[in-house]
Amino acid sequence: MQCAQYTAGHCHSCQWLNKSYSQQLSDKQQHLQQLLRETSATYWLPPVSSLISGFRNKAKMVVSGSVERPQLGMLHRDGRTVDLCDCPLYPQYFQLVFESIKIFIAKAGLVPYNVARKKGELKYILLTESRASGEMMLRFVLRSETKLAQLEHALPWLQEQLPQLTVISANIQPTHMAILEGEKEVIFTEHKMLKEIFNGIPLYIRPRSFFQTNPEIASALYATAGRWVRELNISSMWDLFCGAGGFGLHCADKETRLTGIEISAEAIACAKNSAKSLGLEQVEFQALDSTHFALDKAQLPELVLVNPPRRGIGKALCEYLSRMAPKFILYSSCNAETMAKDIAALEQYRIEKVQLFDMFPHTEHYETLALLIFDGK
């Protein structure tokens, strides 16, 4: 992949851009195999490769510059700004969307926030696309509510220019710290969420819910999880750290008793919408802490699926699963190092199969899916 910003030394977010893509995949696979060398897997499946450009469905842009000539991109620690509207990780048509947003920022008088001076209003724009429909969600992250009326008044022009923007909102983030979003969300449109479809499964994206940024690989990851689980012929499962329900909904059928747990109420609302659309009556989603939920239960289902944040599932949940010994654990991870530590702590389990999914090309990061089977006495 060619990137003018990388070549010019303006952006090095893609740390591995100087490696061939085949070398990137090989290095990631070797890294994963080294991490799991003490817990040998029965089956190592080949890594799932990604598109190398145009694969991202979400842009998180720092807004800088002036209200007349805003920039959308990133802010270096030394205060330098870089416009990344031509970033090749996004589909090319995102550039036209960004240009219209820049014009709108000027029309609406949304002064970019100046970090050094602690002045201005508009901090970020967050753009997400549904690949299924082409519809988009646009969020303006503002320092205060001062410009809300001004923003809303100017919206008809933006909606005329970009009719694919079906969800538009403002998030209020008043603190000076480098926090992407705040607690308050103001939605300006009739539609409150985007609908995405992976493998025939409807999934929903609300403004403050997490969703994977590489839809092709996310779709393959969910489909693989569903296929592995169906081969086990189970009737009950938990989906811990379930997000918008992508994993559990791919694994469950109308007979499966599925409980999905996620701390984010926004994500749980999305998961419930999906389950309702699919007519899954034995599926339940709850907005709770996954570890606290599990530790409170005296009985476990046949399979526990975990998809934790980068820190892993942690000591308490590892000890609980070791003690309660569900027959299967399906572990999905965005941090293979913490996953390897967790698996090492699950001493009574063996890895039946493991596969790498290249969710983040041109970086050292990747997703892993591992099926663990209880092998204790």
Curated annotation (Swiss-Prot):
Q: Name one GO molecular function term.
A: iron ion binding
UniProt xrefs under InterPro entries: 23SrRNA_MeTrfase_RlmC (IPR011825), MeTrfase_TrmA_AS (IPR030390), MeTrfase_TrmA_CS (IPR030391), SAM-dependent_MTases_sf (IPR029063), U5_MeTrfase_fam (IPR010280)
Q: Which residues form a coiled coil?
A: none
Pfam families documented for this protein: tRNA_U5-meth_tr
Q: What broad class of enzyme is this?
A: transferase
Q: Which UniProt keywords apply?
A: 4Fe-4S, Iron, Iron-sulfur, Metal-binding, Methyltransferase, rRNA processing, S-adenosyl-L-methionine, Transferase
Tell me its family. Belongs to the class I-like SAM-binding methyltransferase superfamily. RNA M5U methyltransferase family. RlmC subfamily.
The UniProt function text for this chain reads: Catalyzes the formation of 5-methyl-uridine at position 747 (m5U747) in 23S rRNA.
Report what the protein is called: 23S rRNA (uracil(747)-C(5))-methyltransferase RlmC
* Provenance organism: Xenorhabdus bovienii (strain SS-2004)
Q: What is the lineage of its organism?
A: Bacteria, Pseudomonadati, Pseudomonadota, Gammaproteobacteria, Enterobacterales
Gene for this chain: rlmC
